[in-house]
Amino acid sequence: MTGQRATPQPTLDDLPLRDDLRGKSPYGAPQLAVPVRLNTNENPHPPSRALVDDVVRSVARAAADLHRYPDRDAVQLRSDLARYLTAQTGVQLGVENLWAANGSNEILQQLLQAFGGPGRSAIGFVPSYSMHPIISDGTRTEWLQAARADDFSLDVDAAVAAVTERTPDVVFVASPNNPSGQSVSLSGLRRLLDAAPGIVIVDEAYGEFSSQPSAVQLVGEYPTKLVVTRTMSKAFAFAGGRLGYLIATPAVIEAMLLVRLPYHLSSVTQAAARAALRHADDTLGSVAALIAERERVSTALTGMGFRVIPSDANFVLFGEFTDAPASWQRYLDAGVLIRDVGIPGYLRATTGLAEENDAFLRASAQLAATELAPVNVGAIANAAEPRAAGRDRVLGAP
């Protein structure tokens, strides 16, 4: 203010922050205005005109009641989700099996509020989705981790051994895994469920792209252990709508009611998500095209000399670069934003539209000539331990 001495703005160090949060890095993927954005695994196909019109009409109807709180339990939305999943998985589901929230990260947070917390632990198999440890930290759940195999796939024997030895209260399994893209078979999941003493969360954010059956098929076999989480941010092209959900036995839904904030899901979000579900067949029609593009990109990268990790999602992890952060910058200089997920020698690229993928491949061809390291399979094991986060390097998110 005029006439007064300026008071220095406090820093984070000046605040009475919890000690266990000091020194932590927040999640952050760059949001940059570049010609080609392939860094956050969104569906590049925009919503259809019919879907947009439906959302506008639905939100307009909801807006007439904005002076009232929304449906606290989102019953109609959960019923729509149950119908969609019943058709997709072949498993008969009802509203009592579904819970919804603002993105799958809020779902994961609620699960750890209910089944994690002080004195409890959660384990994940790295490299994997970076929000699993971040949400664990935020809920005071001790984070444990075990390494994946040298090719970044889940070594089920090693995973079972780690769960048996460390007896975590919560086990995270991403299938398909982010950032490597591999899915876990139902037989592998059964072995983990048999070994786990507590809850197993199968994170199926990219489930619509997977060639493996959904873990939803196992909910009836493991009603006190299995929770499957999903999102509408990826295949459903609804990232801006922020809608995540889980599938589980009704008792798990009752647990969510104990920890959710009242009226957590706005009437606008519920209306827009229900409209998106009405157009599921049209929107998900892009999945086959994206899988075909993913395979085209993978084949082209392999032909250039890159090591491409076989993917079951809408992205590919590829390398091996002599200096991945420097290569990430060179892609950006070429107008292509991809992701440095913190694995030494590797970068991740979302599958975009054909013309976006062509631009990415042109940049890749230029980099392949000068920036690839000699393949050293033995060194890949070290990639399971992420380097320190910096710029965009938060392991595997989103």
From Swiss-Prot:
Catalytic activity: L-histidinol phosphate + 2-oxoglutarate = 3-(imidazol-4-yl)-2-oxopropyl phosphate + L-glutamate
Region described as Disordered: 1-30
Top-level taxon of the source organism: Bacteria
Skewed-composition ranges (Polar residues): 1-10
Gene3D superfamilies noted in UniProt: Aspartate Aminotransferase, domain 1, Type I PLP-dependent aspartate aminotransferase-like (Major domain)
Pfam family, one: Aminotran_1_2
EC number: 2.6.1.9
Chain ranges passing through the membrane: none
Record-linked InterPro entries: Aminotrans_II_pyridoxalP_BS (IPR001917), Aminotransferase_I/II_large (IPR004839), HisP_aminotrans (IPR005861), PyrdxlP-dep_Trfase (IPR015424), PyrdxlP-dep_Trfase_major (IPR015421), PyrdxlP-dep_Trfase_small (IPR015422)
Residues recorded with modification N6-(pyridoxal phosphate)lysine: 234
Gene Ontology BP annotations: L-histidine biosynthetic process
Keywords attached to this entry: Amino-acid biosynthesis, Aminotransferase, Histidine biosynthesis, Pyridoxal phosphate, Transferase
Pathway: Amino-acid biosynthesis; L-histidine biosynthesis; L-histidine from 5-phospho-alpha-D-ribose 1-diphosphate: step 7/9
Gene Ontology terms, MF aspect: histidinol-phosphate transaminase activity; pyridoxal phosphate binding
Subunit record text: Homodimer.
UniProt similarity note: Belongs to the class-II pyridoxal-phosphate-dependent aminotransferase family. Histidinol-phosphate aminotransferase subfamily.
Protein name, UniProt field: Histidinol-phosphate aminotransferase
Species for this entry: Mycolicibacterium paratuberculosis (strain ATCC BAA-968 / K-10) (Mycobacterium paratuberculosis)
